Amino acid sequence: MRKIFVPETKDRTADAVVIGGGIVGTATAFWLSKAGLDTILVEARDGLSTLTTAASAECFRAQFTEPALAPLARKSIEFFEHFAENVGIPGWDIGLHQQGYLFVTDDESMIPDLEAALTQYHKLGVTDVELLTGDQVRVRFPFISTEVVGATFRQKDGWLSCHEVTQGFAKGSSARFFVKTKATDVFVDKKGVSGVQTTRGKISTRVVVNAAGPFAGVIGRMAGVDLPLE
């Protein structure tokens, strides 16, 4: 069964519609379909992950001090570490490289801040972050400036291919991914969202996920929601 394609023009129904075919929208469609919802993703461009996802630095890290963010990052990394198994595609390679993430400072007065960050990381369950002196940093990374006096480091941070992650989420999903299909309006009735008009027909639905990235404000206004985006 085709999953990523240009659909014929006709009206449809779906349990959920995701607008935007970047890594966030595609991951959302994956999890919605995994939860048993008949899901359609619509993407205006020729393919998935071709706009902001394609411009990503593609780095990931668990070194966050925000209580709401750190657990999400940690769980995401654990998912990436077993991505092929998790999406059900044996051998799918997302180019995962866990060669570490180093935060350095050349200011002695910042060392207490690094120590406080380390304490917070451990408190949030990220217990494999190290606090290094400048000399310890240069033993591992000889190219680091002699002006660096301290750093935090986590070996399991790194980078991956956002394109391959996006494609893996799509191909491992039971959702349908409509490319060259632009959302032009969002319909709302007394019960809430009722459908999405696209350049290839209307999709009746009660669930719409706005994953349009820089165009999220435009999509929001279609549904009468003014998002604070600039």
Regions found by a protein language model. Give the residues of each.
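Extreme N-terminal leader/targeting segments of oxidoreductases
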Residues: 1-16, 31-35
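Dinucleotide-binding Rossmann-like beta1-alpha1 core, especially the glycine-rich loop
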Residues: 57-140
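Helix-loop-beta segment of a Rossmann-like dinucleotide-binding subdomain
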Residues: 11, 92-103, 128-134, 138-173, ...
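Helical element adjacent to the flavin cofactor pocket in flavoenzyme catalytic cores
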Residues: 152-207, 211, 215-218
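Conserved Rossmann-like nucleotide-cofactor binding loop
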Residues: 24, 47, 215
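Glycine-rich Rossmann-fold phosphate-binding loop(s) that bind the pyrophosphate
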Residues: 20-22, 26, 44
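Glycine-rich beta-alpha-beta "Rossmann" dinucleotide-binding loop(s) and their flanking helix/strand
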Residues: 218-230
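Glycine-rich FAD pyrophosphate-binding loop
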Residues: 33-53
